Swiss-Prot record:
Residues 70-219, 251-428 form the GAF domain. A divalent metal cation 2 binds at residue 598. GO terms for cellular component: plasma membrane. GO terms for biological process: cAMP-mediated signaling; visual perception. The active site is at residue 557. It comes from Bos taurus. This is Cone cGMP-specific 3',5'-cyclic phosphodiesterase subunit alpha'. It is a lipid-anchor.
Amino acid sequence: MGEISQETVEKYLEANPQFAKEYFNRKLQVEVPSGGAQAPASASFPGRTLAEEAALYLELLEVLLEEAGSVELAAHRALQRLAQLLQADRCSMFLCRARNGTPEVASKLLDVTPTSKFEDNLVVPDREAVFPLDVGIVGWVAHTKKTFNVPDVKKNSHFSDFMDKQTGYVTRNLLATPIVMGKEVLAVFMAVNKVDASEFSKQDEEVFSKYLSFVSIILKLHHTNYLYNIESRRSQILMWSANKVFEELTDVERQFHKALYTVRTYLNCERYSIGLLDMTKEKEFYDEWPVKLGEVEPYKGPKTPDGREVIFYKIIDYILHGKEEIKVIPTPPMDHWTLISGLPTYVAENGFICNMLNAPADEYFTFQKGPVDETGWVIKNVLSLPIVNKKEDIVGVATFYNRKDGKPFDEYDEHIAETLTQFLGWSLLNTDTYEKMNKLENRKDIAQEMLMNHTKATPDEIKSILKFKEKLNIDVIEDCEEKQLVTILKEDLPDPRTADLYEFRFRHLPITEHELIKCGLRLFFEINVVEKFKVPVEVLTRWMYTVRKGYRAVTYHNWRHGFNVGQTMFTLLMTGRLKKYYTDLEAFAMLAAAFCHDIDHRGTNNLYQMKSTSPLARLHGSSILERHHLEYSKTLLQDESLNIFQNLNKRQYETVIHLFEVAIIATDLALYFKKRTMFQKIVDACEKMETEEEAIKYVTIDPTKKEIIMAMMMTACDLSAITKPWEVQSQVALLVANEFWEQGDLERTVLQQQPIPMMDRNKKDELPKLQVGFIDFVCTFVYKEFSRFHKEITPMLNGLQNNRVEWKSLADEYDEKMKVIEEMKKQEEGNTTEKAVEDSGGGGDDKKSKTCLML
């Protein structure tokens, strides 16, 4: 045979890599040369050089790289080599995890020898040996996170012979070390029974530690990747469930179903089931009768922590293995495969998270040991947890079955499932809120219907004003033509000149409230809006009568006040000639808003609403009563039979509603001081203009200026009683004062607070002084500026000034009276003091003792 060249050998080895690998594995332990220079010896591997030690690590890295896809395979190859290097009889790997909040170790690779097969050493999930950390040396290693070299296990208090009894193997000594990542123990590696010695040496510990430091890289890499997948799944679950939860707000079942079905691919299980609990806490009285009569046994079954009977009214099964399927079972029977074990009921009763390994073997719960249905599917591992809402009531139970990779559910699965169920539970707040809103909306509709029934003008009340039956001999108003109704209504309305409707001095006291309704109707005809905007007179009559009924029978803010404000608005527009700045539609809206501005007033002011925390105060943050008057007015217009603006187009109607908002909110005196400077600037600008047309153009070209003037007009109308003739003003002022005193009485009795002087009945004699202050501080500016703006409005200022003279006279009389009383009081106090001095004996020496007698 010829000589083999180096080139031939290289070609053969390259062509047969498996042979080359096996050959070098066998020849790895080379003999130390006997002569010549020796290579440096390894401290960790006796009998090997540093080069050979490096070759071992290189081989390990190649193995780890080759088996990087499976942590079990990589660990198995490493344990095989360790068993050889340490001369250990066998090696094992235990994984560390946590379930139900309790850490534990579970066997993953057992009895690994240099020649054993991976399949024989791998422990499948349903055959794992699981220990808590307080059992066995492996548990103690995981607990302390330290390496332990135990020369004699019988002398170690932590040793447990459980595994020996199961396998018949006898453990004499062992070496165990943890793989730690941060504060978390990932696994425990163990070498058992030194073959050529009675115990593992210090050098064995070093070999074990160094070798496993490389293995730990793979474990940490896999664990990091696992944590990344966990967080990715968690974020996807939260994102998709949030997306679906906010898609569905009307029904909790549909909300749950949309969210749970969308995230099914991220739950990593074969099946999951959602049981929805009956939320009824108290039974109806008629359901309790049979129990009280003894005909039915009282309920003695499990109850939720808040006292509800555990009744699943619906179960939804999500089957993800094989053909995907969703089954909805209303009123499920107790022998349904999810309920028969008793686990969902237990979770609903106690609120615990239950993570069960090898569930069919559990003795407490009765899981089916065989297939649960025709698919042949078998329960292995179970994770069940409650769905809890923000009130901490258990609303359902979510149960997950069989992790797809065959492993039991771990603490990270618990975290993901808990995140999902917690989010679903909290999302119930949306549906609960939506349901409450619906109920409130329905109650509002019912209340509105009741309100309309009692407030809306009846047919007989309409007939009392619109006398179609008497004049047309027609029984049903629908049979009348609109022109006929207009004619008979206008005939029956008062003459505006005779009734002084164009005058600022108009007096309402001699006129009945019913006649005031007719006067109000007349004003709409006077501004020519009824025919122009095609307002049905029946609707106008019904609206005006309903507005009158909407005012409560309070002392001052009643229908008479409402009408007076409307009449003053009309007078400002027509007599005061402010109409030239506004269109007919705007004038129509302003007049209607003036009539409605205090509708449903309660006789108390905004401050009282806030102090008493009334529903109105909770509903409206500012301008409380004004916003209520506005909403009431808009509510009336929502009824077609009361909508006097029904024939306007959309844009016109929106304009009217906007003007209503500006006009009615402007009556809040708290806003008066904000707007009066702006109004004064408009007046100053108009006063400098030479022609009327120039002033009209200046105002009308800017909608904001028109709104400011309108807001100030509403204030002037609201305070107009202060400008009426003295005989009217003096009576009205007493009505206002009485209403204030009534509020003061409420503050004193209900709120237990001392009212301010203006509302204190005990200080009613100070009314003239308070009126003078009110005129000077609030009213004078309004009417002075309007008189400057339009000379036609000067009568209001004159009336105000005349009334101030009267009130000042009364205030001065009161001050004089109080001054006299004060002087008399001082004089009386002086006399009392002199008498006290005389009685004390200071007046002379002839005073005798009343207790001692000189004989």
